[in-house]
Amino acid sequence: MKKTVLVLITFALVIAVAGSGFWLVHYFIDSREQRQTYETLAEEFVLESTPSVRPESSSSLDSSVDAGENDVSSPVESPDTPPRHDLAALAAENPDCVGWLTIPDTGIDYPVMHTPDDPEHYLRRDFYGNSASGGTPFLDGRNLAEAENQNLILYGHNMMDGSMFKPLMNYLEPNFRDTHKDIFLEIDGRQYRYALLDVLETNTQCSLYQYTDLNDPVTESNFRAAILKETDLEGVHQAPGYLTLSTCNNGGGSSRVLVIAALAGEVSQ
């Protein structure tokens, strides 16, 4: 009897291991195909023009955000300004594409999707709508696809192969935060630079998820108060807009990591 039970347990373990191996192989093949898809998109839809004037230092831009003096209508530049993408051509390829997100030297370089009537449509779909475990970064359905007066919440998966929003985990390390403060978002036909405010480990009940439309001054003030409550920041000055990047923490479940940034201004052409 004991021998029979042992054989059954061994058989079950073999099946489980084989199944896990098959899943892992499928996962990484799928991930590789997705990576190739987004690399191709980045190459095909990149624009040739780049800022020609010597960029202003990142520290001076950060100080303008901290002082609440930066005007989004006044273009700014950054030392590592990434190339722009042809958003009109991307939208012609897929009307759900409203922007492009880039964080230099992190691997985050993806189109941004927006489907207000079905907010999580791209949770497990690639740019072309095909089934994909990594999905495509997407904008919260409550947001407007514009930079000003919005807390733009972008969602992306924490993938085992290091793709999508996995690099956001690195922001939990102080040294990484200090050297990756610039976040670039192309949206509404323009390219914007956001300056990093803070990163936090939280969950899906975090109060920052409640804020998307900041057009009302009271709501905007309440949002900044919520940032102070959720982080260790001592103060957050008013900015024209904000960006919140959200991904699952390594612990899974309802745990999340949020990277919060303030709009520094439009990048000049």
List PLM regions with ranges.
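Solvent-exposed, non-transmembrane regions of membrane-associated and secreted proteins
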Residues: 16-269
